[in-house]
Swiss-Prot record:
GO terms for molecular function: phosphatidylinositol-3-phosphate binding; protein-membrane adaptor activity. One of its GO terms (biological process) is autophagy of mitochondrion. It comes from the Eukaryota. Disruption phenotype: Still forms preautophagosomal structures (PAS) in proximity to the vacuolar membrane. The lineage of its organism: Eukaryota, Fungi, Dikarya, Ascomycota, Saccharomycotina. InterPro entries: ATG2. Keywords: Autophagy, Endoplasmic reticulum, Lipid transport, Membrane, Protein transport, Transport. Residues 224-234 have a biased composition (Acidic residues). It is found in: Preautophagosomal structure membrane; Endoplasmic reticulum membrane. One of its GO terms (cellular component) is phagophore. This is Autophagy-related protein 2. PANTHER family: AUTOPHAGY-RELATED 2, ISOFORM A. It comes from Kluyveromyces marxianus (strain DMKU3-1042 / BCC 29191 / NBRC 104275) (Yeast). It catalyses: a 1,2-diacyl-sn-glycero-3-phosphocholine(in) = a 1,2-diacyl-sn-glycero-3-phosphocholine(out); a 1,2-diacyl-sn-glycero-3-phospho-L-serine(in) = a 1,2-diacyl-sn-glycero-3-phospho-L-serine(out); a 1,2-diacyl-sn-glycero-3-phosphoethanolamine(in) = a 1,2-diacyl-sn-glycero-3-phosphoethanolamine(out). Residues 211-221 have a biased composition (Polar residues). The gene is ATG2.
């Protein structure tokens, strides 16, 4: 065109031409500047692009505006394009997941180029255009001559293309709350031959949170309709007339203004690039728009990740959609595999799009002042099919401090080689590196990780698509030596990694060796070593790992990430370990809070799913399956802590096998150990501290769970813990003043994280300080809860087992037993105590409070095991003794009288006469007399006790309350320990050997309680006597039965036991802090014991009495009856606060008690508690006898029944007057032990002697008549005398009160009749019972059945077996241990068999409750005796018939005649006795309760 055309017509022609280009269809003629000629110039201002014609993949263009655009065209073919102020507003497309979205970009670009070419050639291409845009399924016709001409023109134009754009801006609306703004300062591109060179300057990306929400814009349907109908109108007339898109332009302008205004809100810098240099080849024709041989050079790239964390949630959904779209694209690219294979077979190489990239500096800003910088990053893919990437250097900088050090080398820091033909990638770390981490860096990294944890979780949770395993890329990683330094202030931890490698998909990551060192004061120590660490990860599928859950059942752990460690060995000194722990706690103390703030989830789904595995059979195995984020397996872990407590403790070796650590996606962490043991190694001695008990080694026995809320749960099964109480002395000396102060400071807080511990079949073994015994506490099931303010323990059953010598533990293969108690019993332990339902609650604070509640304690014990148990419990507390010089003040203090006086105090040498004032004499003018005040100098007398109480200092620090509902102590005869039985056997054999050799045989005494008399003749068998004493049965000669009896002999039962212990400060006070008074003392602790009810049950087979001790039944109210039967309060004080000497103060209160004392039971109890084994004697370095400062006991009323069995005549001849008591039987003797207060007593043995010396004379002087009245022969007469006395005393008292003589005489008579009548009946019962016994003994002597004829059916004390009664005169003798003297006091007893023992039942037992029952029992007993007579006569008749001669017949008649006469008499006496007993009990109901408590029952 020439310049003679009018300007208006040139604009109209240009407008018509440009509108043929789809992007510029909205151009207005008023915004055009046209100059057409050899150097044509086209100028555009304020262009609104037709964004409906722009189709980008997954992106919708909302608006496009160009402020200024210039186009210069030369006839020679040069094309220059310059623009300024380009703004595009975009958003994610609505059809984001459409499969053909990626093809829309190529179609839009091709259409725009075609429109531009058509406008330049000024030809009609409508027909050709229609052919271009036919469906892709139609065949494409070969190019025409016109097509070739167009392609040639385009090549010339593109070869001389120059572009210069300024102020380019892209605004991407990610969501209504978030926008991304990308700004480019300048874009320059020039063309030289086939090369294109472009420079992009000043690229920045900013995220913005608009102050107002940005609406979503899309192309309306009306716009599309207008666009579709535009071709039907006349193009030229349309261009000349007013543009119909003016309204749309106005709308877009308003929308753009709204978007720009929204950028005034809060902005976040994301990316900065100072300059990008791009060089490429391509875009030469309309049919070849490909770009190849692309080379990019970037000077500096800054990525600000610290600003992205706050808006990360908004863009994650967009990234997820992009990921899903890319995955679909990858699936579609699988269709080109056959084509790629064809190219490979034909050796046809494709032109590479990207051949070289150089990035001088890449800086990731993680957080404030923390960044990672990579320098000289280069990518080279010029040589096909290889691609190499290298990083020259890497830096990690925080606050201008660099944390990564590299070795010097000419090679790049990191290099990556990729082979596209084999999909193999090789990454090499070419330098030795050293990474240092301190608290500041670790804190910033954890905060950064917390910010991006959601991104990691979404990557893990992203659904994986199926891919061909053969198509997985191969990745090889190798490195040089890596050193990781953890700076903890005064300590540096070094981790040295050997060259590690990775081989994906086989091994994700592997470290052959990792060595750990500690550096203190420039001294380097080797701590531990890890070998064969492997890390595996899967994109699809999961690793299935066998584990265990909290119920110790098999569980499967499914995870995509797994780490395996073959061996972990740590060897460290205790001092170094303490230093490391101190540094870690100080430096990393706040890190757990940072970690807890990450990974918050809201899902409440069950973490475990049930999986079913089908076996070959029809059985199904159900295992729990846990989904985890990662899993770590440690096959073997060994930790050795040396020189504990300064070599005094030795070394501690901790071993764990088959350890499993995993965390689920809800941040619950689980740790399990299959074998976890700890062993102490001291010189050549090895002691197991933590060990397996009766546990299968294939099942985990230690599981720890840490929930996302921070609660720790521990589960233990089959775990035993051994503690030697002497170890506390080793560690107590290691406590420094700072550690003690720290403990006091944190005394109110136990733990910061709640801990729950559950125990299943576990045990705690304790060894005392000085003894060789061992105490084991079996815990079948228990739960321990530890919170910030308290510790609670609850269990249903506890079993206490004891062994007398731990050196005698059987080292045999125990295998798997039925219970933990059996496991210990096989080792030689003996079960002694069982505790039912125990609960403990401990609360720290100013006053530490402990509450212990026990439902029932049941103990079955022998004398030797009881002695061992008591001594063991005493010895469990560490021994604390002091020499005399620190307990007492052995030397008086020297007091200087004149210390506070000056030397010149009493001299007048320095007094001047001028200093003396002379006062004149004064006299009283009045004649008043002097008045003297008496008692002016007399001090006020105060109670010493009050002064002492006021001067006592008791600062309570802890309070322990123990409550026991019921306790049973069953005392067995026999001996538990093999050593005891062996000593008795040796003593007996020595006596027998000496007797056979004719040597003198003095009596032997074993264990201070077992007396073995020497044999008096050859017929006496010591072993048989011992067996008779213990088991009440004779055995074969030469065999002794010393094991415990099957039934207990004494039962001590207590109910409602309460113990309250208050402890104070036991530290010495210095003399400077003491008050002036000498009466000041410190109270160390105060203990009170209350027992509501205490009973001792007599179960000896030779005793007829039931309860040895019980509460006296008083005719009082129930409230008084419920008061404690026994109360004890004792206080330990320190009389001199600056000395270690202590004293005791006792106060005892006992309610009235009843004693039914059988001499055999008394002797058994005495010998039981006197047993002393020299092995269990506690010897202190400084023996201390307890000094009792004050002892007080109230007046005790005793109702005593006493039945002697034998008399010690030897002791009687030696002056023991107590033996006179064994001549008499006492029945309800009333004894009152008077109130006693004692001061200054040395030891408890001395206390016993003093009390005996006080009470015995008082009883003999003031209470002898009452005791004599309780003697059995005089008891009836004493009752009759009391009745006669009541006949006078009662009327007199009643007459004095009421004044009525008749009523008084009536009451007196009633008392007389009731008393005398009852005593007459009792006397008759005694006479009839005595007569029955005499008749039965006579019958027995004459060959009859004797007491066997009663035929009483009884129940055993601890069984349901029914046996028949029998009598054996030979065992009516004394049953003392080695004395066969006849016993005449058993004439009213009958012996009944009871398993391995024989039970004796008195004739006074099982009395009828009323007169009717007495008649019924009398009738039954009389009939039974007549039947016995009839049977004996019938038997005699049969014997006479079968007799061989008259002499034998007469002998049979002589034997049967007395029996026939005596047995009916026995029946009469027994019937009369039962009748009288029923009559007596009819009028005295209290006698029934007394009989039931006193006598054993046959029922």
């Amino acid at each position: 065109m020439t310049s003679w055309l009018p300007q208006n017509l040139q604009k109209r022609l240009l407008l018509y031409t440009i509108k043929q280009v789809s992007l510029f269809s909205n151009v207005d003629v008023s915004n055009l500047d046209v100059s057409i000629g050899s150097q044509s110039h086209f100028g555009f201002t304020d262009i609104d692009l037709n964004v409906c014609e722009i189709n980008l993949p997954n992106i919708e263009v909302l608006s496009g505006r160009i402020s200024k655009l210039n186009l210069q065209l030369a006839v020679a073919g040069n094309v220059e394009i310059s623009g300024e102020g380009m703004v595009f507003v975009l958003k994610p497309a609505d059809g984001f997941f459409d499969d053909d979205s990626s093809e829309q970009w190529a179609s839009s670009l091709t259409k725009s180029v075609m429109d531009m070419t058509k406008s330049i050639l000024d030809t009609e291409l409508s027909e050709y255009q229609s052919k271009i845009y036919k469906d892709t399924n139609e065949d494409i016709k070969p190019p025409t001559a016109l097509d070739s001409m167009m392609d040639k023109v385009l090549r010339v134009a593109l070869s001389k293309l120059t572009i210069n754009l300024k102020n380019v801006e892209l605004q991407l609306i990610i969501s209504p709350e978030l926008m991304l703004k990308i700004s480019i300062s300048e874009v320059k591109m020039i063309s030289a031959d086939e090369k294109r060179i472009a420079d992009v300057i000043g690229v920045s990306a900013v995220f913005s949170k608009p102050e107002q929400s940005v609406p979503s814009y899309g192309s309306s349907s009306s716009d599309k309709e207008d666009d579709n109908t535009s071709d039907s109108e006349d193009p030229l007339s349309t261009s000349i007339t007013y543009s119909k898109l003016e309204a749309t332009s106005i709308y877009l302008s308003a929308m753009e203004s709204l978007v720009l205004d929204s950028l005034d809100g809060e902005t976040y810098q994301f990316l900065n690039i100072d300059k990008i240099e791009v060089q490429f080849q391509g875009i030469t024709s309309i049919n070849d728009l490909k770009v190849h041989d692309l080379k990019i050079k970037i000077n500096a790239l800054d990525i600000h990740l610290e600003n992205v964390s706050s808006i990360l949630s908004h863009i994650m959904s967009l990234l997820n959609h992009v990921q899903l779209s890319n995955s679909e694209d990858k699936i579609r690219t699988q269709e080109l595999k056959s084509y790629k294979r064809f190219q490979h077979e034909q050796n046809i190489e494709e032109d590479k799009t990207l051949t070289f990239v150089l990035l001088n500096s890449l800086k990731f800003h993680l957080r404030d002042n923390l960044f990672i910088m990579l320098t000289e990053i280069s990518l080279n893919s010029s040589v096909s099919p290889y691609t190499s990437v290298s990083i020259s250097d890497i830096q990690l900088v925080l606050d201008s401090k660099e944390y990564i050090n590299r070795s010097d080398s000419s090679e790049p820091f990191l290099s990556l080689n990729k082979n596209s033909s084999t999909s193999e990638q090789k990454l090499h770390l070419n330098r030795d590196i050293k990474v240092e981490v301190d608290y500041s860096l670790m804190k910033q990294l954890i905060l950064f990780a917390n910010d991006y944890m959601c991104l990691y979780n979404q990557i893990i949770e992203r659904p994986s698509t199926y891919a061909d395993p053969s198509a997985d890329p191969k990745f090889l990683l190798s490195s040089q030596n890596v050193c990781f330094l953890l700076n903890l202030g005064d300590l540096i931890m070094e981790f040295h990694f050997s060259p590690f490698f990775s081989n994906i998909p086989h091994t994700t990551f592997k470290i052959p060796k990792l060595s750990i060192f500690s550096v203190q004061n420039n001294e380097k120590s080797h701590i531990g070593e890890l070998t064969d660490f492997e890390f595996h990860s899967r994109k699809s599928g999961c690793f299935n790992i066998s584990g265990a859950n909290s119920k110790f059942c098999a569980s499967n752990v499914n995870t995509k990430t797994k780490a395996t460690l073959e061996n972990l060995e740590v060897s460290i000194l205790e001092s170094d370990m303490n230093k490391i722990i101190q540094c870690l706690s100080g430096v990393l103390g706040s890190l757990p809070e940072l970690l807890l703030s990450s990974g918050e989830t809201t899902s409440s789904k069950n973490m475990e799913k049930r999986s079913v595995r089908m076996m070959q059979s029809s059985a199904f195995l159900h295992n729990r399956t846990a989904l985890s984020m990662f899993c770590v397996q440690i096959n073997c872990m060994k930790i050795k802590i040396s020189n504990i407590s300064g070599k005094a403790f030795g070394d501690l070796m901790i071993t764990a096998r088959k350890s499993l650590i995993y965390q689920d996606k809800y941040s619950d962490l689980s740790i399990s150990f299959t074998e976890f043991t700890a062993q102490r190694q001291y010189r050549s001695e090895k002691t197991d501290i933590i060990f397996d008990i009766n546990h299968d080694s294939n099942i985990a026995n230690f599981v720890i769970n840490r929930t996302k809320v921070g609660k720790i749960k521990a589960y233990l099964t089959g775990v035993g813990i051994f503690i030697h109480t002497k170890w506390s002395e080793l560690f107590s000396g290691q406590k420094t003043e700072n550690s003690i102060n720290e403990q006091k400071k944190n005394a109110k807080t136990l733990v910061s994280i709640p801990i729950d511990i559950k125990l299943y079949d576990c045990a705690l073994s304790l060894k005392p300080c000085r003894l060789s015994t061992g105490l084991a506490i079996n815990i079948p099931r228990a739960q321990i809860n530890i919170t910030k303010n308290e510790i609670t323990l609850s269990t249903k059953i506890l079993d206490l087992l004891l062994i007398d010598d731990m050196n005698l533990i059987h080292e045999t293969d125990l295998g798997h037993t039925t219970s933990t108690s059996n496991w210990y019993e096989k080792q030689g332990y003996s079960s002694l105590v069982k505790i039912d339902t125990l609960s403990v609650r401990f609360c720290p604070g100013g006053v530490a409070s402990t509450r212990v509640n026990v439902h029932k304690i049941d103990s079955s014990i022998c004398s030797d095991s009881f002695n061992a148990l008591i001594q063991t419990i005493i010895d469990l507390k560490p021994v604390v003794t002091y020499p005399e010089n620190v307990k007492y003040q052995l030397e008086p203090e020297l007091v200087s009288v004149f210390e506070d006086l000056t030397d010149q105090y009493f001299t007048t040498a320095r007094i001047s006469e001028n200093d003396l004032e002379i006062y004149p004499d004064t006299y009283s003018n009045s004649g008043e007399s002097l008045v003297f005040e008496e008692n002016y100098f007399s001090p006020k007398l105060e109670s010493p006790s009050k002064n002492e109480v006021n001067m006592a200092v008791f600062e309570i620090l802890s309070n322990v309350k123990i409550s026991v509902d019921e306790i049973k102590l069953k005392l067995y005869d026999g001996y538990d320990w093999k050593h005891t039985r062996k000593e008795i056997n040796s003593a007996v054999e020595q006596l027998e050997e000496n007797f056979k050799d004719g040597l003198s045989c003095p009596d032997a005494k074993v264990f201070d309680s077992i007396y073995i008399p020497a044999p008096r003749d050859e017929d006496e068998n010591i072993k048989s006597n011992i067996n008779m004493k213990i088991h009440n049965e004779e055995t074969k000669e030469g065999k002794m039965k010393l094991r415990p009896t099957k039934k207990y002999k004494i039962l001590i039962q207590g109910n409602g036991i309460k113990v309250n212990i208050q402890s104070g400060n036991d530290e010495l006070r210095t003399t400077s802090t003491l008050p002036l008074s000498d009466n000041t003392y410190d109270i160390l602790n105060e203990t009170s014991v209350q027992i509501n009810n205490l009973e001792i049950v007599d179960n000896l087979p030779t005793s007829t009495w039931n309860k040895f001790l019980t509460r006296t039944k008083l005719k009082t109210t129930n409230t008084l009856q419920q008061s404690p039967m026994f109360s004890l309060r004792f206080t330990m004080i320190r009389p001199t606060p600056h000395l270690y000497a202590t004293e005791l103060i006792f106060s005892v209160h006992v309610k009235p008690i009843s004693l039914h004392v059988d001499q055999d039971a008394l002797e058994f109890l005495t010998l039981f508690f006197q047993f002393k084994d020299p092995r269990f004697e506690l010897i202190d370095d400084y023996p201390d006898i307890p000094y009792i400062q004050r002892f007080e006991i109230n007046s005790v009323k005793i109702l005593l029944d006493y039945k002697p069995k034998k008399v010690d005549y030897v002791g009687l001849r030696s002056g023991k007057t107590k033996e006179f008591m064994n001549f008499f039987i006492l029945d309800q003797a009333k004894i009152n032990l008077k109130h006693v207060i004692l001061y200054g007593i040395d030891g408890f043995s001395r206390l016993e002697t003093i009390l005996t010396d006080i009470w015995t004379p008082d009883i003999t002087k003031t209470q002898l008549p009452g005791i004599l009245g309780a003697l059995t022969p005089f008891k009836p007469f004493a009752g009759l005398s009391y009745g006669a006395r009541a006949l006078v005393s009662v009327p007199t008292e009643q007459y004095q009160q009421s004044g009525r003589l008749g009523t008084s005489l009536q009451k007196g008579g009633m008392v007389f009749l009731r008393t005398t009548g009852g005593e007459f009946v009792k006397l008759a019962v005694r006479l009839t019972s005595g007569t029955q016994t005499i008749l039965e003994s006579t019958e027995k002597l004459l060959g009859g059945q004797g007491s066997n004829g009663r035929n009483i059916k009884i129940k055993l004390v601890e069984g349901d077996e029914i046996v028949d009664a029998f009598i054996d005169e030979s065992i009516l003798r004394s049953t003392t241990l080695f004395d066969n003297t006849a016993n005449d006091n058993n004439h009213l007893d009958v012996i009944l068999p009871q398993g391995d023992t024989q039970k004796v039942i008195s004739l006074y037992a099982d009395q009828p409750k009323d007169f009717y029952s007495g008649l019924h029992d009398a009738y039954s007993s009389f009939g039974r005796n007549l039947n016995i007579t009839f049977d004996s006569m019938k038997q005699a008749k049969n014997d006479i018939k079968t007799a061989n001669g008259a002499q034998e017949a007469v002998s049979t008649v002589a034997k049967a005649a007395p029996l026939a006469l005596i047995r009916p008499l026995i029946g009469v006496t027994e019937a009369l006795s039962k009748t009288l007993q029923g009559l007596n009990n009819q009028y005295d109901q209290e006698e029934i309760a007394h009989i039931e408590e006193k006598y054993k029952s046959s029922n």
